[in-house]
Amino acid sequence: MPSFDVVSELDKHEVTNAVDNAIKELDRRYDLKGKGTFEFKELTVTLTAEADFQLEAMIEILKLALVKRKIDGKCLEVKDAYASGKLMKQEAVLREGIDKELAKKIVAHVKEAKLKVQAAIQGEQVRITGKKRDDLQEAIAALRAYDSGMPLQFNNFRD
């Protein structure tokens, strides 16, 4: 029986490259030169600047760098800014994996579409199985049209 997996993964090397590009862009910008920093550790980017408006500009620089490296901006979760001495700090977390709630929504969406496929939650991925490859392609089209709030990839196709 043909099947595929729905996952939400990030290419860690591309994320590192995007953060490095954002750091270079920060050094190039005249209005932000020497006023802010990016720190990247384990899918968390900590932004440090002197004021709120600089943090907002830095978030936009980071989002642009991610998009240039073909990483969907939906995976970036920006937390609230907080004061740390004279500086303002803000964290941006890169989310990866499908949590239980999103997996349930994906399964429900597949069932609502009334396709001839079955969806099963398997940890941080959803396995979709069907009798024909055409049914799986319809399921992929339905999931691409669905706005889940997370970037979805389809892999592990089996015939």
Curated annotation (Swiss-Prot):
Annotated CDD domains: YajQ_like (cd11740)
Gene Ontology CC entries for this record: cytosol
Coiled coil (residue ranges): none
Keyword set includes Nucleotide-binding: yes
Source organism, top-level taxon: Bacteria
Disulphide bridges: none
UniProt keyword annotations, A-Z: Nucleotide-binding
Molecular function GO terms recorded: nucleotide binding
Keyword flag Ubl conjugation: no
InterPro entries given in the database record: DUF520 (IPR007551), UPF0234-like_C (IPR035571), UPF0234_N (IPR035570), YajQ-like_sf (IPR036183)
Pfam families in the record: DUF520
Family of the protein in this entry: Belongs to the YajQ family.
Family matches, as PANTHER family: UPF0234 PROTEIN YAJQ
NCBIfam families reported in the protein's UniProt record: PRK05412.1 (NF003819)
Role this protein plays: Nucleotide-binding protein.
Protein's UniProt name: Nucleotide-binding protein PSPTO_4393
